[in-house]
Amino acid sequence: MGTIAMASINTTSTSGGSAAPIQMSGKANAATPKLNSEVEMGSLPGDAQTQEDDIMQVARVGDVPAMEKLFESGEYDATYHDDEGITPLHWAAINNQYAMCKFLIEHGAEINRKGGESIATPLQWAAQRCHYYTVNLLLQHGADPLVTDAQGYNTLHISTFNGNVLLLVLLLHQGIPVDVIDTFGHTALMWAAYKGFPQCVDLFLRWGASVHATDEQGFTALHWALVKGSPGCILKLIEYGADRFAKTQTGKTPSVTAKELNTEVAWHRALTECGFDEDGHPAVPPWPGASYFLKDKRSFVTRFLFFWPFVLVWAMLVAMSSAPVYIGVPLGIAAVYAIQWVAQQVLEYAPSDMRHFHKTPWLTGIFAATLFWTGVNWLTTVLFATTLGAPEGKGHGILNFLFALFFGFTVYFYIASMRYDPGFVPKMNGIAEQKAVIDELLAQWKYDETNFCVTCMIQTPLRSKHCRRCQRCVAKHDHHCPWVYNCVGINNHRHFFFYLISLTMGIVSYDFLLYYYFDTVSKNASETCNVLSPTLCKYINADSYTSILAIWITMQLLWVTMLLFTQFIQVARAMTTYENMFGIRDGTNITALTSTGAPLDPNHPSLSATGPAAAHSHKHKGGMLKSLSRTLGVDPFIETITGRGAVSGKNKRKKKNPYSKGCITNCKDFWCDPAPIFGQRENGSAVLGGERVDYSAMYESPSLMTITGRRDRGGYEAVGTEDVV
């Protein structure tokens, strides 16, 4: 299947399997600047010609005064070009010399002049190196992004070769047709799929790119994705309805293509995750009524995996309490395994983004089930035994009242944390508004992955973060909690905190109730059993079901208290969990820019990365224990108590928390916020340093606002009841 490679289609232009575009010229091959001070090193002037006399070299280094002198001498002007048609604007563009480009344009440079071996424009030279600030400058002054080079590639195609999503977003907002083709009928989507850039594929598909478009040989984007074998690209194309049986002009389907190119593993995996068998046909569950239940897969799987744990928890408790310990424990484990196996079978037919338990409401259902069966046990067993059924003078009405109160609070705040909008940052109303935001960020030199979300197409406020589970940016994002199946953000953070407090107090009060309950019911119980001490034997023999339930709910106290402790410390420090783990973003680290405009910060990788994690600044590594540690909140707890957090220890001296106003003020801001406790707050509203702020529209840190004295859209302000931040 060697002919499948895109290089073979364009044999006159490319060689091998890279299918990379021809470089702008032999000189351009050496242009790999990382900073503005690095210049194109090809064909430097010889001894007979000084740097000041070589207009091309002056353009490379961006020496505007020297260029002015050359123009004043009358030897050159901005329209000068060499024998290959290359102009000073070409060299300034490929080396990201923004000031030089602006100077040349203002002095009459031909902005769409073609030159070099590939006969390309300055815009294409700049796009080849992902210099999107220079690209934007050229576009503002009339550069045509649809002009093609010698190979038939326009600026969108050339930009796709490098996979820089920010540059592609900029170009798409210029009105370039997303399905524009090159000489051989390849769309940008095909190139992104072939190069293995899942983020670019996702961007083009969300922009409306056709998954059914074919090139001259009948290849679709899905065929090209199978050449590279990128699972992310293949999966995304199938999700958007790519034809799994489309044939090329030679009759080859994607399945045949995958087999001949040894990418069957990625192909079959993508098919499975999208609900198809290995032949590409819809997978049909063997259980009765499956076609009815799976009409709406997402709704059915979500509801099933929330309520099925109710059966799991009940079966575990009954199994373990119905037999001696050496039989009950294995029986309980077997029951849990069997019930989870059923859930796993349902999960096989879930949408592709719900194929793992931690991406579903499974853990939420386990907690809800524990809460439900605890309430049932209290109402049917413990309540009467510790009030009306207790010996005279040994009733515990007050303790029962306290438990009922904490139980009710836990239920309410649990539901509030789960159902309330966590603080999703509002999206733009259309492409025009998105373009206005992009233009504003470019004007402020803030167009980068730190300040712009390519998924939501919005300017990201400070302290916000894009949640890959919720697929939205969340204002003052704390963390995504699998136990409430929701993000914890500015809108529901306090509800989540009250949920933890109520849960902790509820478990403690119930344990006290159970102590008095067993003291009453176990007086005549046998002390004989296996393994356990006589006291525990009496409790289990008196009421084994309640005993197992007590052990189960008390175990929850471990992770709850760790999480509660961490949250108390973070509130006192005016930090979120994300900031505690990965550092504080205050909007001041984006002044130093690389040639692409990305921040000079190792914690913020370029969006040209090909992996799914390219848009966020850290990688999640580790096996099952690490995953369990994150799920139970152990990681932030350890980071907090050991002082190894991102804003503690060695990093403490590097950056002060601009959001902290002192422990007392921080706590007052959080706890005395006028937003309703029993109800939903206005989206993004909060208190910071005693002033009302809107975290869904905060773009500069308070410390920077204090220095500059600005109180506009780029920061925060105290507002009245009719004012909007």
Curated annotation (Swiss-Prot):
Name of the top EC class for this enzyme: transferase
One Gene Ontology cellular component annotation held by this UniProt entry: Golgi membrane
Disulphides: none
Q: Where in the cell is it found?
A: Early endosome membrane; Golgi apparatus membrane
Domain DHHC: start-end pairs = 451-501
A molecular function annotated in GO for this UniProt entry is: protein-cysteine S-palmitoyltransferase activity
* Reaction catalyzed: L-cysteinyl-[protein] + hexadecanoyl-CoA = S-hexadecanoyl-L-cysteinyl-[protein] + CoA
Q: Which residues lie on this side of the membrane: Lumenal?
A: 325-326, 386-397, 517-547
- For the keyword Lipoprotein, the answer is yes
Question: Which parts pass through the membrane?
Answer: 304-324, 327-347, 365-385, 398-418, 496-516, 548-568
A Pfam family: DHHC
Q: Which InterPro entries match?
A: Ankyrin_rpt, Ankyrin_rpt-contain_sf, Palmitoyltrfase_DHHC
Keyword vocabulary terms for this entry: Acyltransferase, ANK repeat, Endosome, Golgi apparatus, Lipoprotein, Membrane, Palmitate, Repeat, Transferase, Transmembrane, Transmembrane helix
Specify the protein's topology with respect to the membrane.
Multi-pass membrane protein
Q: What is its EC number?
A: 2.3.1.225
Question: What family is it from?
Answer: Belongs to the DHHC palmitoyltransferase family. AKR/ZDHHC17 subfamily.
Present the record's domain note.
The DHHC domain is required for palmitoyltransferase activity.
Q: What is the recorded function of this protein according to its Swiss-Prot or TrEMBL entry? A: Palmitoyltransferase specific for casein kinase 1.
The protein depicted here goes by the name Palmitoyltransferase AKR1
